[in-house]
A protein has these predicted regions:
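Accessory RNA-recognition modules of RNA-modification enzymes
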Residues: 2-264
């Protein structure tokens, strides 16, 4: 195959520079509004501050370096505060964010999207499982593993509670600005009397078809619209059509049925 022309390479370089510039602006805006994201502390701990500073000095924190776009085998180090598996790339200069992967597991993943110091990745194959945490028999939702609404269904409940306790402990450690001796002990997470059907808040999403988005402000068709209403698939970024959530309370699920029908 012939190499891209000089003009094509120049256009691609300008496009990538614009992408990085826009990402940097968006990140700065996010930090001003919400403060440092929790994953920043995982980045500093796992890459090491000297490596992070080196990448920042080269202005390369958003670059799509290898193994972006290539399958790679890694070992999951920990879970993020959002419940996603985290692993270092073989090069040691990026974090892979892997939904539904567990600490200690060896997984083949595909990094498909990039952010600041991280590549969002999907599991291709689990090569070595964490047998003490991954209990597939606990899963009660047919969408689990695709839907991004929850991450812990395959984990025994007692371990879920400890994971949530650790999230709170790390939040105090990183955001309180207190000396470690002044940070209060985080007590064990109080269990819910219900293992399922306990969540009292759900936030379903929907995407209008492109034809309706283009017709914004015009007359809306009277016939029902085939639109997915549910929760995001983290691997595709698309909304999955989900009629019921087994974690939500019965009252919420009844309300969701009505609202789904009303939107359609």
């Amino acid at each position: 195959d012939s190499l891209p022309s000089k003009k094509a390479r120049t256009v691609a370089l300008k496009r990538d520079r614009k992408r990085v510039h826009n990402l940097q602006k968006a990140y700065q805006k996010q930090v001003l509004k919400h403060g440092d994201p929790p994953i920043l502390f995982d980045i500093l701990e796992m890459l090491g501050k000297p490596r992070v500073d080196e990448i920042l000095a080269r202005n390369e924190e958003f670059e799509r370096v290898p193994p972006f776009g290539e399958e790679v085998v890694v070992k999951i180090d920990r879970l993020s505060s959002h419940g996603d598996g985290l692993a270092l790339t073989p090069q040691g200069d990026r974090l892979l964010v892997v939904p539904f992967a567990l600490p200690g597991e060896v997984v083949r993943v595909y990094p498909y999207a990039s952010d600041r110091f991280v590549f969002k990745s999907r599991i291709v194959e689990i090569l070595e499982r964490n047998a003490s945490m991954r209990k597939e028999s606990l899963v009660q939702c047919r969408y689990f593993g695709q839907c991004g609404g929850c991450q812990y269904q395959m984990i025994p409940y007692e371990q879920q509670l400890e994971l949530k306790r650790e999230v709170v402990r790390r939040a105090f450690m990183h955001y309180s600005k207190l000396d470690s001796s002044l940070v209060p002990e985080v007590l064990p997470t109080m269990p819910s009397p219900e293992r399922m059907h306990y969540r009292t808040k759900l936030t379903p999403h929907f995407d209008l078809p492109a034809s309706l988005r283009r017709a914004y402000g015009k007359e809306v068709p009277a016939e029902p619209v085939d639109v997915a209403i549910g929760f995001d698939n983290p691997s595709t970024g698309r909304v999955m059509d989900i009629e019921e959530c087994p974690i939500g309370t019965p009252v919420l699920n009844e309300a969701m049925k009505r609202e789904r029908q009303r939107v359609r």
